[in-house]
Amino acid sequence: MAIREILVVPHPALKQVSQPVEKVDDELRALMDDMLETMYAAPGIGLAAIQIGVPKRVIVMDLAREGEEKQPRYFVNPEILWASDDTAPYEEGCLSVPEYYDEVERPARVKLRYLNYQGEQVEEDAEGLFAVCIQHEMDHLEGVLFIDHLSRLKREQAIKKVKKHAKAA
């Protein structure tokens, strides 16, 4: 396993649409292991493959609270089968937009279909933080960042803040 570099805005790869995965094999599992290690090291709760420059429809996530046992999750070729009409606001952040947080309104519940770490198809309902996080990460697969849901002014402020933060580092 290896920690990979996380791309930050305005890196052009983050606007790229990720491609479906043909099969879950040892090579893909090695990528997912690297992604998980990278996410934990950041630290974060979710990471899409494109955030480390790999344009594949793969997401890793762990929503365990600090001090709890880790609960890694893997989502290959995830798709939303259904989304609730009711929405919920949630303050989001992103490893590709460091040190910036803002409220985004998303469907409160979704039904997902994806392949897991073993390549088995799973259907699952998501709500709360899980629903927010999976929608946020799935946006990455379409080349969309959470700041793209904000006004142009807020988006520009976020990018400016990230650039300023990068210069200071």
Curated annotation (Swiss-Prot):
Binding residues annotated for Fe cation, in chain numbering: 94, 136, 140
Superkingdom of origin: Bacteria
InterPro entries with a match to the protein in the record: Peptide_deformylase (IPR023635), Peptide_deformylase_sf (IPR036821)
Cofactor note: Binds 1 Fe(2+) ion.
Record GO biological process: co-translational protein modification; translation
Keywords: Hydrolase, Iron, Metal-binding, Protein biosynthesis
Gene3D superfamilies tied to this protein: Peptide deformylase
CDD domains: Pep_deformylase (cd00487)
Active site as annotated: 137
Known EC number: 3.5.1.88
Molecular functions (GO terms): metal ion binding; peptide deformylase activity
Cofactor requirement: Fe(2+)
Catalytic activity annotation: N-terminal N-formyl-L-methionyl-[peptide] + H2O = N-terminal L-methionyl-[peptide] + formate
Family stated for the protein in its record: Belongs to the polypeptide deformylase family.
Entry-linked HAMAP family: Pep_deformylase
Purpose of the protein: Removes the formyl group from the N-terminal Met of newly synthesized proteins. Requires at least a dipeptide for an efficient rate of reaction. N-terminal L-methionine is a prerequisite for activity but the enzyme has broad specificity at other positions.
Protein name: Peptide deformylase
The organism's taxonomic lineage, starting at the top: Bacteria, Pseudomonadati, Pseudomonadota, Alphaproteobacteria, Caulobacterales
